[in-house]
Amino acid sequence: MQVNENPNKVPVELNRTSLYLGLLSVLVLGILFSSYFFN
C-alpha cells in the first residue's frame, strides 16, 4: 500500500501546480481586463 501511495502523490502535486498556475493566469487576466475597462 505504501509503494502505491507514492506514485499517487506525484500526479496530485502536478495537478496542484497546474491548478495554481490556472488561478494565477485567471487573476492576471482579470487584472488586465479590469484595468482595460477602468481606463
Swiss-Prot record:
Pfam families for this protein: PsbL
Signal peptide: none
Record GO biological process: photosynthesis
Membrane topology, from the record: Single-pass membrane protein
Matches recorded under SUPFAM superfamilies: Photosystem II reaction center protein L, PsbL (SSF161017)
Residues passing through the membrane, by range: 18-38
Subcellular location: Cellular thylakoid membrane
Protein keywords: Membrane, Photosynthesis, Photosystem II, Reaction center, Thylakoid, Transmembrane, Transmembrane helix
Main location: membrane
Gene Ontology cellular component annotations, sorted alphabetically: photosystem II reaction center; plasma membrane-derived thylakoid membrane
Family: Belongs to the PsbL family.
Role of this protein: One of the components of the core complex of photosystem II (PSII). PSII is a light-driven water:plastoquinone oxidoreductase that uses light energy to abstract electrons from H(2)O, generating O(2) and a proton gradient subsequently used for ATP formation. It consists of a core antenna complex that captures photons, and an electron transfer chain that converts photonic excitation into a charge separation. This subunit is found at the monomer-monomer interface and is required for correct PSII assembly and/or dimerization.
Assembly and binders: PSII is composed of 1 copy each of membrane proteins PsbA, PsbB, PsbC, PsbD, PsbE, PsbF, PsbH, PsbI, PsbJ, PsbK, PsbL, PsbM, PsbT, PsbX, PsbY, Psb30/Ycf12, peripheral proteins PsbO, CyanoQ (PsbQ), PsbU, PsbV and a large number of cofactors. It forms dimeric complexes.
Name the record gives this protein: Photosystem II reaction center protein L
Organism: Prochlorococcus marinus subsp. pastoris (strain CCMP1986 / NIES-2087 / MED4)
